[in-house]
Amino acid sequence: MAHSVKIYDTCIGCTQCVRACPTDVLEMVPWNGCRAKQIASAPRTEDCVGCKRCESACPTDYLSVRVYLRNEVTRSMGLAY
């Protein structure tokens, strides 16, 4: 089941989320916005199982990576039945 994965620009490029993902949804891509010169990217969200291990692994205080489960996205859009 695909979930929405959002990467925020608060990412510090540490790769913790990439290593924590059991389904390889995340990868690092070049980015000049942080010291590490890389940022997490989520090119394979269709493989996301919603375990949120990437969120747990994120060392920043403001969660640079967030997983929105399918029902959370639907509810926030006012489409829940």
UniProtKB/Swiss-Prot annotation:
Q: Which Pfam families match?
A: Fer4_7
In short, the EC number is 1.97.1.12
Q: What class of enzyme is it?
A: oxidoreductase
SUPFAM superfamilies from the UniProt entry: 4Fe-4S ferredoxins
> Which catalysed reactions does the entry list for this protein?
reduced [plastocyanin] + hnu + oxidized [2Fe-2S]-[ferredoxin] = oxidized [plastocyanin] + reduced [2Fe-2S]-[ferredoxin]
Please share the entry's free-text remark on the cofactor. Binds 2 [4Fe-4S] clusters. Cluster 2 is most probably the spectroscopically characterized electron acceptor FA and cluster 1 is most probably FB.
Domain 4Fe-4S ferredoxin-type: residue ranges: 2-31, 39-68
Q: How does the protein's chain sit in the membrane according to the entry?
A: Peripheral membrane protein
> Which GO biological process categories is it annotated with?
photosynthetic electron transport in photosystem I
Residues bound to [4Fe-4S] cluster 2:
21, 48, 51, 54
InterPro entries, per the entry: 4Fe4S_Fe-S-bd, 4Fe4S_Fe_S_CS, PSI_iron-sulfur_center, PSI_PsaC
Q: Which GO cellular component does the record give, naming just one?
A: photosystem I
For this UniProt entry, the molecular function terms from Gene Ontology, in alphabetical order, are: 4 iron, 4 sulfur cluster binding; electron transfer activity; metal ion binding; oxidoreductase activity
Give the keywords, sorted: 4Fe-4S, Chloroplast, Electron transport, Iron, Iron-sulfur, Membrane, Metal-binding, Oxidoreductase, Photosynthesis, Photosystem I, Plastid, Repeat, Thylakoid, Transport
Per UniProt, [4Fe-4S] cluster 1 binds at 11, 14, 17, 58
Name what cofactor the protein needs. [4Fe-4S] cluster
Subunit comment: The eukaryotic PSI reaction center is composed of at least 11 subunits.
Q: What does this protein do?
A: Apoprotein for the two 4Fe-4S centers FA and FB of photosystem I (PSI); essential for photochemical activity. FB is the terminal electron acceptor of PSI, donating electrons to ferredoxin. The C-terminus interacts with PsaA/B/D and helps assemble the protein into the PSI complex. Required for binding of PsaD and PsaE to PSI. PSI is a plastocyanin-ferredoxin oxidoreductase, converting photonic excitation into a charge separation, which transfers an electron from the donor P700 chlorophyll pair to the spectroscopically characterized acceptors A0, A1, FX, FA and FB in turn.
Q: What is this protein called?
A: Photosystem I iron-sulfur center
Report which gene this protein is encoded by: psaC
